[in-house]
Amino acid sequence: MIDDRIARHNTRVLAAAQALGGAASPIVTSLGGIIGLALSPDRGLATLPVSLVQLGVALGTLPAAFVMRRLGRRNGYILGALLGVAGGLVAAAGVARGSFLAFCLGTLTTGLYIAYVQSYRFAATDAASVGFRARAISWVMCGGLAAAIIGPQTVIWTRELVPGLMFTGTFLAQAALALLTIVVVAFLRPAPFAAGAPRSGGRPLLVIVWQPGFAIAVAAGIVSFGLMSFLMTAAPDAMVECGHSVGSAALGIQWHVLGMFGPSFLTGRLIERYGKERVTAAGLVLIAAAGPRRVRREWRGFKERDDRSSGGRVRPAPGKCR
């Protein structure tokens, strides 16, 4: 019988790391489009900085896995957090210098960092028994609830931290949070099998890819994550365009991320009782149910804006985009 003491310790460490490292995503999402609109040479490129975060996650996921396989979880996560520090500093420099290119480079690097953060929940299962794995994932995901508050509140409280350089302090704070993450992940303990028990190399990647379950999981991830990103990327910029404050836009992202991680208190036990396939299907049904209502509301809002303008940049009065 597997002793879950190390797994429980690592789960607590990873939940704290999720709270700190996970704050990077709502920070960039809250401000990326707004800053992009101010710095970009073309209005159509306004949301590129946020899109580059998602690209960084996609590009960094497999390399992060290879790094951790070679260096171990603790060293790999320290390296990932260093990317987070670099991303925050480069983004801050881009904002301070008014450089759209530098800001985009910073958000891309932040995406590489988030690729490591997103694997925290899976690392929690390394030394866990079969019965504890689902709950370990849920506990780490609960750290995302704290991240949902830390990220947007960092935006609100640090956006004017550097006099005369709006939002520069926010990305410096993002770098500081990544530094704190390094301190936290340093407390990770190696899983028992790492002490000397030989391990097989696992199945070849092509064998895994050709499994029907893999295709279903990828399809579900593409649909759910794609629609979530579609909403999050443009929402803060749209709110500011409709007359809301930057703080309100950050709070909008806060509630969105709380909605993402709030069910973590229940999903572990739901998966144990009903199975991961049924829980995934229920999530997709919720997305499908929410979609038509959101499309109708946004279409009315954008149509009203088009009717009020002749192609120029017009900022509607507060509440007119509803």
Regions found by a protein language model. Give the residues of each.
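Pair of pore-lining "gating" transmembrane helices in MFS-fold secondary transporters
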Residues: 4-37, 108, 210-230, 308
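C-terminal membrane-cytosol helix-exit motif in multi-pass small-molecule transporters
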Residues: 151, 155-157, 175-196
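C-terminal ends and interior cores of transmembrane alpha-helices
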Residues: 82-97, 286-298
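Cytoplasmic helix-loop-helix junction between adjacent transmembrane helices
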Residues: 104-142
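C-terminal transmembrane helical hairpin of 12-TM major facilitator-type secondary transporters
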Residues: 271-320
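Juxtamembrane intracellular "pre-TM" segments in multi-pass secondary transporters
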Residues: 1-8, 189-219
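Hydrophobic core of transmembrane alpha-helices in multi-pass small-molecule transporters
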Residues: 19, 100-115, 302-317
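Helix-to-loop junctions at the C-terminal end of transmembrane segments
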Residues: 60-73, 159, 262-276
